[in-house]
Each structure stands twice: as structure tokens, then as C-alpha cells.
């Protein structure tokens, strides 16, 4: 009970601040200590020499979208030639992406990481009413807004379910220079559904058993997704499972029924880098390759050795870091 009270106090503290509106962004003045240590909890699993300088902290900003406010963490760099938008997956949030955002900043990117609707600190009228299509629209709209505000080249990095969101954003906007993803899960595939879900029946029968009448029920992701396979590091898996984020059943149902706007055979929006963990027990490489191998655009595959679904293990995390540097160099025209 005490931890619940402390958590509530922490979030109330986070939501205090002064709004400063610039274009369609609302910037809040907040102290990093209000983040309740979530960022550092995830950073702790990076190899020591890859952890950022303690002085590197994200800035909290807010973007008005569909009557709500999307929380976006940023590492501004006015001298950066390339910007990177990082997109989390189901059950994730910006703080969970901080280790990868910090590595991207270290490779020269200006970085932004949104909390997608219903997760993290973003504010929506009803989290239980959020559908997968809202996430697709949100990421695409954010790409458009960011490109309108800043013409620098933009790369979208998608982790887990965020991989398909990055793909959709590039296909829908035509404004992305490249996408980098850790996996590409097409939920139309029974094999993909079996790997996504905690229960085998999800792969066999899929969305029809998740009837709309229960769409508004909110459940922790750990109860429906195979989150015990998040990492091969027990401590990291425990951290993720304990993270109190939950999504509506309607979100899962609409995700399982989703169809990409552009089939991979017709996707030519930008090059695609698949940076796939080599020891991913949740979504093995074969699942992603069913979609990736069909993509018409120039594409690159890198298997991250000994890395799990949340890829922080050596040597995979170093390979990912090098790949980010290579992508930056390529997009910047070096």
C-alpha cells in the first residue's frame, strides 16, 4: 500500500508545472526527479560503458492531439544533422525506451520519444477506448507535425510492436528518410499471434474470441502478452512485468485485426533496417522475416548476437549502437 501511495504522489508531482505553448507543442517545466527513477531502472541493464553521462536527461514536452495531450521526451540538438523518433511497443512507454534514446543521442541524433495514447504520461479521455488504429494515426500525425516544425531528415526507430508502427508511419506520410526496427510482427499470421500472446488459443483463434463487448476492460499487458520472454536477464524481465501499465482489451482486439495500409511488396517509402535480437524468445527472427523478406524497398538485416527481445545484452547492444551510427552517417549523406 505504501508503494501505491508513493507512486500516486509521484505522478501528481509530475503533472504539476507551467505550460509554454510553441506551435502545437506544450512544453512543461519539470524536474527530472519527478520521473520516479523509471529511466534509471532501465539504464541499469546497459553495459557500464554504454550508459550516458548522468547529465544527459530528456526534456518533457506535450503535444496536443485529438483533444488530449501526448507526452514526448526529447533530447534537443540544434547541431544534429538527423533526428530520430523512437516508438515503443505494447505495454511500453518513453522511459522504457530511454536506454536506446540515449544511445541514439550519443550517435549524433536529436531524439524524441512519445508516450503513445493510453500509456506513460500521455493524457486521453479514456484509456480503455484507445484502439490500435489510434496508435497508427498518432505516430503518423506526429511525423507530419515534426516535419512541419523542423525540416531535418527524420528516422523512425520502432521497438517490438513499434516496428510495425514505424513501417505504417513511413508508408502513410512519405516523410521518413529511413526506419529501423527490432521486429516486424504481422498479426495476420497465426505464427505471429502465437508468439505475441501468452496463451496458445490466441494464435489459433485470434481476435474473434475477444468480443467488442469487453473492449473497455483494462488489463495489464503481462496477463495477455508473453512478457516473461521480454529478456534473458531475469532482473530486467521482473522490472518490465512490475511496470504498472495496462491496455484495453479493445486495443489488443483491434491490433490482431489490423492490416497495413501498404503491403510489403508495394512498400517503397524508404530503406528499412531490421536490427533483430538473435536470442529473442518472444518474437524469433523467423516471425519478422515473413514480413521483412517481402519488402520492396532497400533493406538491411542485422542479427544482434545474444540479444533478447529488449536488446541490452553484449555483444548485441554494441552491434545495435554501431548500426545507429551507420544509419546516421547514411542519412546525413556522409
Whereabouts are the PLM-identified features?
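Short alpha-helix in the alpha/beta-hydrolase fold that links the catalytic acid
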Residues: 270, 284-293
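Active-site glycine-rich loops that stabilize anionic/oxyanionic intermediates
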Residues: 89-92, 278
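Catalytic active-site module of serine/aspartate enzymes centered on a nucleophile-bearing elbow/loop
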Residues: 298-334
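Catalytic nucleophile-loop/oxyanion-hole region of alpha/beta-hydrolase
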Residues: 91-96, 120-151
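An N-terminal hydrophobic leader/cap segment in hydrolases
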Residues: 8-64, 68-75
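Short beta-strand/loop motif that positions the catalytic acidic residue
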Residues: 268, 274-276, 280
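Alpha/beta-hydrolase-fold enzymes
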Residues: 159-245
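Conserved alpha/beta-hydrolase
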Residues: 94, 101-125
Amino acid at each position: 500500500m505504501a508503494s501505491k501511495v508513493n507512486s500516486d504522489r509521484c505522478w501528481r508531482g509530475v503533472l504539476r508545472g507551467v505550460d509554454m505553448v510553441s506551435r502545437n507543442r506544450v512544453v512543461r517545466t519539470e524536474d527530472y526527479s519527478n520521473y520516479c527513477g523509471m529511466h534509471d531502472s532501465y539504464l541499469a541493464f546497459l553495459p557500464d560503458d554504454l550508459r550516458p553521462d548522468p547529465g544527459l536527461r530528456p526534456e518533457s514536452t506535450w503535444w496536443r492531439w485529438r483533444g488530449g495531450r501526448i507526452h514526448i521526451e526529447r533530447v534537443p540538438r540544434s547541431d544534429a544533422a538527423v533526428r530520430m523518433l523512437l516508438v515503443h511497443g505494447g505495454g511500453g512507454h518513453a522511459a522504457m525506451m530511454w536506454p536506446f534514446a540515449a544511445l541514439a543521442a550519443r550517435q549524433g541524433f536529436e531524439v524524441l520519444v512519445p508516450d503513445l495514447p493510453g500509456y506513460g504520461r500521455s493524457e486521453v479521455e479514456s484509456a480503455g477506448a484507445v484502439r490500435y488504429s489510434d496508435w497508427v494515426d498518432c505516430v503518423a500525425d506526429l511525423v507530419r507535425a515534426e516535419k512541419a516544425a523542423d525540416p531535418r531528415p527524420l528516422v523512425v526507430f520502432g521497438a517490438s510492436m513499434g516496428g510495425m508502427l514505424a513501417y505504417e508511419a513511413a508508408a502513410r506520410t512519405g516523410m521518413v528518410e529511413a526506419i529501423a526496427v527490432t521486429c516486424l510482427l504481422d498479426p495476420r499470421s497465426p505464427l505471429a499471434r502465437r508468439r505475441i500472446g501468452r496463451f496458445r488459443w490466441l494464435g489459433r483463434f485470434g481476435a474473434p474470441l475477444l468480443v467488442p463487448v469487453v473492449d473497455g476492460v483494462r488489463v495489464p499487458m503481462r496477463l495477455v502478452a508473453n512478457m516473461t520472454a521480454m529478456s534473458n536477464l531475469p532482473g530486467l524481465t521482473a522490472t518490465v512485468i512490475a511496470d504498472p501499465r495496462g491496455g484495453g482489451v479493445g486495443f489488443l482486439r483491434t491490433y490482431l485485426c489490423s492490416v497495413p495500409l501498404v503491403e510489403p511488396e508495394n512498400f517503397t517509402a524508404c530503406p528499412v533496417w531490421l536490427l533483430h535480437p538473435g536470442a529473442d524468445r518472444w518474437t524469433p527472427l523467423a516471425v519478422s522475416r515473413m514480413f521483412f523478406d517481402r519488402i520492396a524497398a532497400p533493406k538491411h538485416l542485422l542479427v544482434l548476437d545474444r540479444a533478447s527481445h529488449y536488446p541490452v545484452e553484449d555483444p548485441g547492444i554494441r552491434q545495435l549502437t554501431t548500426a545507429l551510427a551507420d544509419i546516421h552517417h547514411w542519412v546525413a549523406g556522409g
